[in-house]
C-alpha cells in the first residue's frame, strides 16, 4: 500500500523503514495521506487538509481514559449489546476494529477481545496504540490479557479463527450524516484512507457461523440493516442502533 511516510522524531534509528517493511507500506511523496512517526506516537494526516490534525490511537489518555474512568462501563450500549450480565463476560471478535474504541470499552469491563483490521495503515495505528497501552503502569497488565490485534481481512479470517468467540462485533464504515466536529474530522481523514466498506454485507453470514452466541452490528440510525437482514432484536441509542443476530451454537 502506498502512502507518504514521514519521520518527525529526529532519530536516525531507521524506525520508519522497519515500520514500512512490517506493514507492507511504500513511500509515495505525492500521496495526500501521510503516516507520521512523531516523538509521541504514530499518526495519520490528510496533507491537503492540515487543519484536521492527526488521527492516532490512544488507549492511555484523552477521550479513552475519560470514557474508561467516567463512562457507563457495563451500562454502555455496546456492553449491553454483547450480552454482558453478572459474571458473564463474553469472548469477542471485533471484526471491524477501526480505531479500537468499542473494543477497548469491552476490554475495560472484562471481556477478552480480538480485533481484526485489514487496512495496514489502520493496523499500524492500532499496534502503536497497543504498544503504548501495554507499557502503561495503570492499564498495561489487563490490556495485554484482554486486547489483541490480528492484521487480516475479516472476509477470510472469520472462517479461520480459533477458538470460536461467543460474540462477533461488526461496525462497518457507513457514510456519516452527523456534523459534529469530532466525527467530521476523524471520518474525513479516515474515509479518505479506507473508504466505505462496500463488501460489508458479506461479513454477516460468516460472523453468524463463527459466533457461538450472537453477532452485534452497530449501525447509524438511518442505515438499513446489514445485508438487508432485519432482526427484531436491537438496542437503540441516540444516533445508533445495535442489531443483534443469533450465532451458531457449539456442537457437542
Swiss-Prot record:
It comes from the Bacteria. It is an enzyme of class 2 (transferase). Signal peptide: none annotated. It is found in: Cytoplasm. S-adenosyl-L-methionine binds at residues 101-102, 117-118, 153-154, 171. It holds the Pfam family SAM_MT. Keywords: Cytoplasm, Methyltransferase, rRNA processing, S-adenosyl-L-methionine, Transferase. The keyword Nucleotidyltransferase does not apply. GO terms for cellular component: cytoplasm. It catalyses: guanosine(1516) in 16S rRNA + S-adenosyl-L-methionine = N(2)-methylguanosine(1516) in 16S rRNA + S-adenosyl-L-homocysteine + H(+). Its main location: cytoplasm. One of its GO terms (molecular function) is rRNA (guanine-N2-)-methyltransferase activity. Its EC number is 2.1.1.242. Specifically methylates the guanosine in position 1516 of 16S rRNA. Belongs to the methyltransferase superfamily. RsmJ family. This is Ribosomal RNA small subunit methyltransferase J. It comes from Salmonella newport (strain SL254). The lineage of its organism: Bacteria, Pseudomonadati, Pseudomonadota, Gammaproteobacteria, Enterobacterales.
Amino acid at each position: 500500500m502506498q502512502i507518504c511516510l514521514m519521520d518527525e522524531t529526529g532519530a536516525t534509528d531507521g524506525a520508519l523503514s522497519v515500520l514500512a517493511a512490517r506493514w507492507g507500506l511504500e513511500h509515495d511523496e505525492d500521496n495526500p495521506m501521510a503516516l507520521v512517526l512523531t516523538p509521541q506516537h504514530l499518526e495519520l494526516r490528510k496533507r491537503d487538509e492540515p487543519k484536521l490534525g492527526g488521527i492516532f490511537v490512544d488507549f492511555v489518555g484523552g477521550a479513552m481514559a475519560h470514557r474508561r474512568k467516567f463512562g457507563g462501563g457495563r451500562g454502555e450500549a455496546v456492553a449491553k449489546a454483547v450480552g454482558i450480565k453478572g459474571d458473564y463476560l463474553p469472548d469477542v471478535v471485533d471484526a471491524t476494529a477501526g480505531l479500537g474504541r468499542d473494543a477497548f470499552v469491552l476490554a475495560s469491563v472484562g471481556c477478552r477481545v480480538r480485533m481484526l483490521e485489514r487496512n495496514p495503515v489502520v493496523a499500524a495505528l492500532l499496534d502503536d496504540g497497543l504498544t503504548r497501552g501495554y507499557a502503561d503502569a495503570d492499564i498495561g497488565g489487563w490490556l495485554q490479557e484482554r486486547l489483541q490485534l490480528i492484521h487480516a481481512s475479516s472476509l477470510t479470517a472469520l472462517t479461520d479463527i480459533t477458538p470460536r468467540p461467543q460474540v462477533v462485533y461488526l461496525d462497518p464504515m457507513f457514510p456519516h450524516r452527523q456534523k459534529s466536529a469530532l466525527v467530521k474530522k476523524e471520518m474525513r481523514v479516515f474515509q479518505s484512507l479506507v473508504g466505505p466498506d462496500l463488501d460489508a454485507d458479506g461479513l454477516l453470514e460468516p460472523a453468524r457461523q463463527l459466533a457461538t452466541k450472537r453477532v452485534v452490528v452497530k449501525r447509524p440510525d438511518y442505515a438499513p440493516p446489514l445485508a438487508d437482514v432485519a432482526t427484531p432484536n436491537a438496542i437503540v441509542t441516540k444516533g445508533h442502533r445495535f442489531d443483534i443476530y443469533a450465532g451458531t451454537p457449539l456442537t457437542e
